Amino acid sequence: METMLKSNPQMQQRNNHSGQETSLWSSGFGMKMEAITPFLGKYRPFMGRCCQTCTPKSWESLFHRSIMDLGFCNVILVKEENTRFRGWLVRRLCYFLWSLEQHIPTSSDASQMIMENTGVQNILLGKVPGAAGEGQAPDLVKKEVQRILGHIQTTPRPFLLRLFSWALLWFLNRLFLNVQLHKGQMKMVHKAAQEGSPLVFLSTHKSLLDGFLLPFVLFSQGLGVLRVALDSRTCSPALRALLRKLGGLFLPPEANLSLDSSEGILARAVVRATVEQLLTSGQPLLIFLEEAPGYPGPRLSALGQAWLGLVVQAVQAGIVPDATLVPVATAYDLVPDAPCNMTHDLAPLGLWTGALAIFRRLCNCWGCNRRVCVRVHLAQPFSLQEYTINARSCWGSRQTLEHLLQPIVLGECSVVPDTEKEQEWTPPTSLLLALKEEDQLLVRRLSRHVLSASVASSAVMSTAIMATLLLLKHQKGVVLSQLLGEFSWLTEETLLRGFDVGFSGQLRCLAQHTLSLLRAHVVLLRVHQGDLVVVPRPGPGLTHLARLSMELLPTFLSEAVGACAVRGLLAGRVPPEGPWELQGIELLSQNELYRQILLLLHLLPQDLLLPQPCQSSYCYCQEVLDRLIQCGLLVAEETPGSRPACDTGRQHLSAKLLWKPSGDFTDSESDDFEEPGGRCFRLSQQSRCPDFFLFLCRLLSPILKAFAQAATFLHLGQLPDSEVGYSEKLLQFLQACAQEEGIFECADPNLAISAIWTFKDLGVLQQIPSPTGPQLHLSPTFASRDNQDKLEQFIRQFICS
């Protein structure tokens, strides 16, 4: 391949490939391809079942196997049949007529009900110590309450809602090819709504457009007008005023004041009363659990946790008997408003800037067939009350990363402590801190649990599969016919793991659609015999492909963790460049594998892994090991003197039983019995295993290489510095390394921030107050070059070159 790309004819084609490339994109490659059946015949996995450990009753009651066969609908496909009228004119005005026929429930006087709320009344009467109403005239306090309430919400305007839904439907049809929604998932939500509990949709946040798309999708399916909790940082004051009239909710700035602030107490009381009024009136609520796109930082949204805490508080106080939580996820081929530069915070979106962005987008889409596909996923609803009761029994002791991993990194200890990792990067808001400590912990773990369910239910789009193949297997280029075969293989591997894909159709059409969406990051070159070569563009193009490939990581996450753990176990025994047969000779004991998997689990951020809080690390280790065996990478090896795997005779109980708070419901009972030395495994010698093993290891390479380069960056002595300044310097260092080594997938601001926060948790960096603000310092433990080298060596053992 390298020789073919470096030949003189190909270099000449590359120099003047602009016109030829345009013809290649428009001609459909000029090749005859076979059809693809990406759903393994009639089988299509149904994703999004709720947790059977935390919500067993919801798991049984809101699901029936018949809903799996209901198929999909295109939400934005509105025709004459979707209206009550027929005729030539109706076919041209069907969008407008459809918006007029949508049912918008009449809203009661919410402001009056909020003013009559017990918490607000106590402040008005001066019964709350330290609140703004103490010692003030009730009329003045009432005006302040109305001002705060006006900042939070206004009564939705039916005319504006109909006009906006018509305009949005027209815009979405020109922006997207389709917006697919599973009818069975929608049937589950309708069934949950009939039980009488208010619906609270908890969603991922891939795009700023989610705040418009999701309410429109649910509104079109007969769920009424959603109240959407939005971030005031992303909107200008004029846009916030418009969005309030369309159902938007915004936290007042006073709500984030200190707990003893009188203005903060009043604002938080009004916000609580607003949420209680929404829940009692049965209006559905949409909360985003992820931070807005374009803001480097923690994955879990502090604002989302604040709104979710208000819902939990209302249920705990008995304001409503229960609330039904619905995890939601949106998957795009390409995110429409993905920021090009993620190193700086985005400016708030205004009315004129938003209108200009829409106009530019429409101009780009005019006469263009590069529109993206969208999938909206609604996971199985579950009861908040049931989760609250069952989840508390899953809580156990936790320790910081410094106590768990630092002694092992420095070689002071070899035993991994038998406890879970405590890692929380999302800063708490005053609304969350106002709750009891036990409820704060409940909200944090519930948000992580729901976000994990949302990500697990999200389908894998064709761009993620194509980007993964180009980034991890073919950075130097690949023949199109080979790429299509591997595309089909990776699609089937995704489906076999119980994850859905967001595409269907012929392989030729899928390839043309996907590569046309990625044309800014790949190059097509024609070679002899009519075939084509697909070459990723170096530089920022690889960084973009790395971001797309992260969408595929949850599908193979367990195997990727296991493969990197095996790589770390073999690092001290076999040279990394050694042949696969030599690595397959080594015996890997079960205890050694467990230890390496645990070390890697502790090192990787929870924002990346998204483990369910009800699952212990040891259960996850067993799951990783089972996955490696199922995919054929590991084969059991019976050592001399060990019990055969088929021996089911009575065994002695182990002297130490590791009872985990989550309960281990695995089918295997081997954890309760002694096995001398444990089971042993070898790497499989099948011909496909070396490439698949390398593929799995490279899935985690971007973050592991970024961590290793961050450890190297410690040698340069750039501390002390502020966290923002140090993250910018680290990003510049990653970009410089990318230019030298060609590892552009590591030059990502989110990876730089993750490395800094992980090093803070590990005790490598310390944050010390100073007159100019908090400053990052190198801890005394890692001030020596030897300990810095140990840290880098510990990280690099998991990286497969």
UniProtKB/Swiss-Prot annotation:
UniProt protein name: Glycerol-3-phosphate acyltransferase 2, mitochondrial
The organism of origin for this protein: Rattus norvegicus (Rat)
TM regions (residue ranges): 306-332, 450-472
Entry's Gene Ontology cellular component terms: mitochondrial outer membrane; mitochondrion
Pathway(s): Phospholipid metabolism; CDP-diacylglycerol biosynthesis; CDP-diacylglycerol from sn-glycerol 3-phosphate: step 1/3
GO molecular function: 1-acylglycerol-3-phosphate O-acyltransferase activity; glycerol-3-phosphate O-acyltransferase activity
Top enzyme category: transferase
Subunit structure: Interacts with PIWIL2.
Assigned EC number: 2.3.1.15, 2.3.1.51
UniProt short sequence motif HXXXXD motif, positions renumbered to this chain: 205-210
Region of interest (Disordered), ranges: 1-24
Keyword Acyltransferase in annotation: yes
Membrane topology: Multi-pass membrane protein
Free-text function comment from the UniProt entry: Transfers an acyl-group from acyl-ACP to the sn-1 position of glycerol-3-phosphate producing a lysophosphatidic acid (LPA), an essential step for the triacylglycerol (TAG) and glycerophospholipids. In vitro also transfers an acyl-group from acyl-ACP to the LPA producing a phosphatidic acid (PA). Prefers arachidonoyl-CoA as the acyl donor. Required for primary processing step during piRNA biosynthesis. Molecular mechanisms by which it promotes piRNA biosynthesis are unclear and do not involve its acyltransferase activity.
